[in-house]
């Protein structure tokens, strides 16, 4: 792109490091704007290192109603389904999210099995399945019927995570929620918190989920703030390689940890900017430059 001046990457959390890098390499001098309701941990870590400047919009869009999130143990699923049946019978609409499309995927709840479970409690209300494999024409028909109130519940995969704007939807159930990242779950919650009515999300947690997974999901019970969720995700997953391509896990920092040492990182960032912008060519600074180059020698540098 000879005249590319601005690259905007929306829903940034859905792209891999190398995908973003290839795009930016087409015009190295272009300005880049990355947008996300929930920054992934690596992105949050880069803000502390100075690669990204951050603008935080900490207000909800006007007209949004209250939203609550509740974690539900797997053994209470039947009671939850009865409650959902009453809600949908009263006119509520919503989504039931599963981690698998087909049966037999490592014991995961699939959309066909889930539809059978919820149908027992929804009476005459219509239930449809929506996945990435659903033909385009059928997908449009389902979404249109849902928007018109003809469908009570859509059983789906994460295909509804973005781009689904149905203001009347007020109910979300995520089965085996421990299988999803906090970013995904927060994005899915946004599908049912788009109008003035109160909305609710239920996160069904498997018996096999460990204490770590349960603690992670409880973050969503306490906040609807995307940036706070990203910071918690950073603590649970780690920021990934700040100079590499891994997007989660513990970074190879020698003397600090994120986010615990954020203040130290910001101080180092300010010092580095001061040196670079001041065109420092002192022997001390050159020694630091060579030291950093030595630490990253042989690594894939994509930042």
Q: Over which residues does each language-model region extend?
A:
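Conserved Walker B
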Residues: 4, 11-13, 101, 159-160, ...
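SF2 helicase catalytic motif II
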Residues: 1-35
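Catalytic P-loop NTPase motifs of RecA-like helicase/translocase cores
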Residues: 15-16, 41-42, 104, 180-181
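Amphipathic alpha-helical segments that mediate coupling or scaffolding at interfaces
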Residues: 23-26, 47, 70, 87, ...
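Structural recognition of the conserved hydrophobic beta-strand(s) that form the central parallel beta-sheet
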Residues: 8, 31-37, 46-47, 97, ...
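C-terminal helicase module of SF1/SF2 nucleic-acid helicases/translocases
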Residues: 77-93, 110-303
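Short regulatory helix/loop adjacent to the ATP-binding pocket of P-loop NTPases
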Residues: 3, 41-61, 164, 217
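Conserved interdomain linker/interface between the two RecA-like ATPase lobes of SF2 helicase motors
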Residues: 51-115
């Amino acid at each position: 792109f000879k005249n590319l001046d601005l690259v905007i990457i929306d829903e940034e959390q859905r792209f891999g490091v190398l995908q973003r890098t290839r795009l930016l390499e087409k015009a190295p001098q272009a300005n880049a704007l990355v947008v996300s309701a929930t920054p992934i941990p690596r992105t949050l870590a880069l803000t502390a290192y100075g690669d990204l400047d951050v603008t935080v919009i900490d207000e909800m869009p006007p007209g949004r109603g209250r939203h609550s999130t509740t974690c539900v143990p797997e053994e209470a699923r039947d009671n939850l389904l009865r409650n959902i049946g009453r809600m949908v019978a009263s006119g509520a609409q919503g989504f039931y999210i599963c981690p698998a499309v087909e049966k037999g995927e490592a014991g995961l709840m699939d959309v066909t099995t889930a539809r059978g479970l919820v149908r027992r409690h929804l009476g005459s209300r219509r239930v449809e399945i929506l996945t990435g494999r659903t033909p385009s024409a059928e997908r449009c028909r389902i979404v249109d019927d849902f928007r018109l109130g003809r469908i009570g519940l859509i059983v789906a995969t994460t295909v509804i995570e973005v781009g689904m704007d149905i203001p009347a939807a007020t109910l979300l159930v995520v089965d085996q929620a421990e299988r999803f990242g906090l970013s995904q779950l927060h994005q899915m919650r946004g599908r049912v918190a788009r109008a003035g009515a109160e909305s609710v999300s239920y996160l069904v947690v498997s018996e096999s989920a460990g204490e770590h997974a349960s603690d992670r999901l409880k973050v969503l019970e306490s906040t609807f703030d995307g940036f706070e969720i990203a910071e918690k995700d950073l603590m649970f997953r780690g920021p990934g390689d700040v100079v590499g391509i891994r997007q989660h896990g513990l970074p190879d920092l020698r003397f600090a940890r994120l986010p615990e040492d954020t203040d130290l990182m910001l101080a180092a960032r300010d010092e580095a900017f001061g040196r670079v912008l001041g065109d420092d060519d002192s022997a001390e600074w050159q020694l630091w430059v060579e030291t950093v180059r030595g630490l990253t020698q042989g690594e894939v540098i994509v930042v």
